[in-house]
């Protein structure tokens, strides 16, 4: 494993569970993939680091036997909308600030253990994985007339901690788990190799549509600063009633472990901070807890550089992957 706060040497392999589900004629198996996966999967098949293999990945998933192939980006858009509106509500009604992002499950667990006083600051929004999973077990199940108990919801993630997240108590919108099985980018690569698919020669195919197309804001979730930038864009649009096409948030982009900035939103100075890597998070949160640092929004990612450097990605030095994928 590339990144793990507890020092795990390897992930728990769930590929056989997925294969068994696909081979069960009574189950409808639906898969979603995070944006960081398409930027790294090609490395397992000899392609240059950072090659976008979205189309071939979708084709491979269909040939593995998945009934529907969805893009987690749509769930990310929903997370953005909810998080931006939650921030607006807290500002207008004197809610708990700073609002701290909650889509990195390793970070959330770290907060619960070491900074319990800040758990009320965490956004109440589900992560993109869980948003998409909830849609699959509710909207998709209702549309297709399928009992949610007969749907196996699978996610492909760059993150090993997603295996933990799917089993949290509050992740069951339809009364059944939003996501049943989570596998990593490396596990998907193993499945493709076991099926003897010639990945490089696969055609380019599109995701199945969810409720419409997703946005670029959803795609940047995979890089440190991306969640905060997406939420700021949305909050500014909602508060000012204008679609801002050309606002630049350069100060919170890039691979540095700690970034901060102040942006003018609807006449208000919004102070924000972005941290990736738990060492950096630990230092910042101590300052927030003591009152030494004061922000409106804080983004925390467990892995240095964000999800592109997740523990389930192909093995590469994190500095190499950060430079390639985020750019």
Label every PLM stretch briefly.
Residues 10-327:
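Iron-sulfur-associated redox domains of electron-transfer enzymes in respiratory
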Residues 1-7, 302:
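Cysteine-centered iron-sulfur cluster-binding motifs in ferredoxin-type domains/subunits
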């Amino acid at each position: 494993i590339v990144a793990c706060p507890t020092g795990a040497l390897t992930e728990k392999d769930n590929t056989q569970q997925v294969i068994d589900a696909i081979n069960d004629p009574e189950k409808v198996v639906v898969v979603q993939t995070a944006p960081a996966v398409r930027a790294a999967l090609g490395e397992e098949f000899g392609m240059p680091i950072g090659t976008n293999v979205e189309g071939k990945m979708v084709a491979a998933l269909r040939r593995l036997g998945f009934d529907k192939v969805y893009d987690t980006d749509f769930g990310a858009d929903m997370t953005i909308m909810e998080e931006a509106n939650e921030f607006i509500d807290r500002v207008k009604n004197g809610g708990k600030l700073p609002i701290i992002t909650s889509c990195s499950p390793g970070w959330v667990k770290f907060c619960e253990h070491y900074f319990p006083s800040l758990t009320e600051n965490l956004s109440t929004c589900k992560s993109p994985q869980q948003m998409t999973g909830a849609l699959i077990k509710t909207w998709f199940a209702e549309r297709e007339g399928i009992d949610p108990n007969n749907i196996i919801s699978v996610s492909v993630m760059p993150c090993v901690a997603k295996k933990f997240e799917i089993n949290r108590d509050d992740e069951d919108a339809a009364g059944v788990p939003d996501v049943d099985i989570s596998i990593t980018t490396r596990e998907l690569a193993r499945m493709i190799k076991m099926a003897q698919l010639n990945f490089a020669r696969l055609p380019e195919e599109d995701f199945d549509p969810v409720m419409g197309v997703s946005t670029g804001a959803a795609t940047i979730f995979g890089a440190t600063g991306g969640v905060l930038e997406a939420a700021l864009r949305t909050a500014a649009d909602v508060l000012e009633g204008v679609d801002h096409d050309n606002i630049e948030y350069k100060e919170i982009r890039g691979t540095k472990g700690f970034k901060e900035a102040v942006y003018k939103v609807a006449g208000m100075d919004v102070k924000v901070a972005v941290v990736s890597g738990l060492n950096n998070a630990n230092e910042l949160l101590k300052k927030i807890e003591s009152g030494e640092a004061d922000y409106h929004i804080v983004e925390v990612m467990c892995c240095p550089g964000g999800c592109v450097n997740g523990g389930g990605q192909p093995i590469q030095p994190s500095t190499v992957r950060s430079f390639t994928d985020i750019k």
